[in-house]
């Protein structure tokens, strides 16, 4: 399935540590033969990211705060110079101020709302716009969403609104970039103990609930999400765009 990825170039946004979904996808893409550019948000995350990147021969690291247009533009100018063409973009970026995930949704602040949608949604649009000129042979853009975009998950709050906006953005980007043979899809993973997920109140209860209700009787493993990312990057998924692919052990199909 992944042999067609040999020698292609990918950019992975959102690697925080070895437990992150972005890292699992990066490992899979590297194993499939892709050349990787891996970004980290700031200096605080730089050392851990660099240690991880060093474990993937040939991979390079770049600092990029996706809430700043100038940094996105600078990154892609650098990538154009170093790689020429890009084939895959992995966008695994989401953030809301911690207090917005603890308070009642009705008390969401204007600033918290703005930050959540800017970082979690607009960044995908900004990255896609910057990447498209380098994806002249077509390619795949993959982002990460969650079931709370459709149904109420207590305390997911404004992040659920952001995920709904992200999924809508996926459809519009898929429509507009389709003429360039660029596919855009989202993976909706079940809850996983990642750095980002730890900021959500009641994560333990979410994991327990998923395990009890999912048809497969367990929670999804991060490696399974990583494999799905590789699939969406590969030509095996060449007819799939504008979709939300669930990797949640079937939890989303349950009605009770």
Where are these predicted regions, by residue range?
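A glycine/serine/threonine-rich, flexible loop-to-helix segment
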Residues: 50, 179, 189-214, 254-256
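Canonical Rossmann dinucleotide-binding motif of NAD(H)/NADP(H)-dependent dehydrogenases/reductases
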Residues: 3-38
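Short C-terminal tail/terminal secondary-structure segment
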Residues: 229-230, 241-256
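Short, small/polar-rich loop/turn modules that mediate ligand/substrate recognition or access, typified
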Residues: 178, 183, 240-242
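A conserved structural motif in NAD(P)-dependent oxidoreductases
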Residues: 214-225, 236
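Conserved mid-core segment of classical short-chain dehydrogenase/reductases
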Residues: 64, 68-73, 77-82, 91-114, ...
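A short hydrophobic alpha-helix cap/turn motif
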Residues: 30, 84, 135-136, 175-180, ...
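Catalytic loop of short-chain dehydrogenase/reductase
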Residues: 14-21, 94-129, 137-179, 191-193, ...
């Amino acid at each position: 399935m992944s042999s067609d990825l040999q020698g292609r170039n990918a950019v992975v946004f959102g690697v925080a540590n070895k437990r992150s979904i972005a890292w699992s996808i990066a490992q899979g893409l590297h194993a499939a033969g892709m050349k990787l550019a891996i970004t980290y948000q700031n200096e605080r995350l730089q050392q851990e990211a660099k240690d991880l990147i060093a474990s993937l021969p040939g991979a390079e690291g770049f600092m990029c705060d996706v809430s700043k247009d100038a940094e996105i533009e600078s990154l892609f100018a650098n990538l154009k110079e170093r790689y020429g063409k890009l084939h895959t973009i992995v966008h695994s970026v989401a953030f809301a101020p911690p207090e917005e995930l603890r308070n009642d949704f009705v008390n969401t602040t204007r600033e918290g709302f703005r930050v959540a949608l800017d970082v979690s949604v607009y960044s995908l649009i900004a990255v896609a716009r910057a990447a498209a000129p380098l994806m002249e042979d077509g390619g795949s853009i993959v982002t990460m969403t969650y079931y709370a975009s459709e149904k109420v998950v207590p305390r997911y709050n404004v992040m659920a609104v952001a995920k709904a906006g992200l999924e809508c953005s996926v459809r519009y980007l898929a429509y507009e970039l389709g003429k360039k043979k660029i596919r855009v899809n989202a993976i909706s993973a079940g809850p996983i103990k990642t750095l980002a997920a730890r900021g959500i109140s009641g994560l333990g209860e979410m994991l327990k609930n998923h395990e009890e209700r999912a048809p497969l009787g367990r929670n999804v493993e991060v490696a399974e999400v990583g494999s799905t990312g590789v699939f969406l990057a590969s030509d095996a998924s060449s007819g799939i765009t504008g979709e939300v692919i669930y990797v949640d052990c079937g939890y989303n199909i349950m009605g009770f």
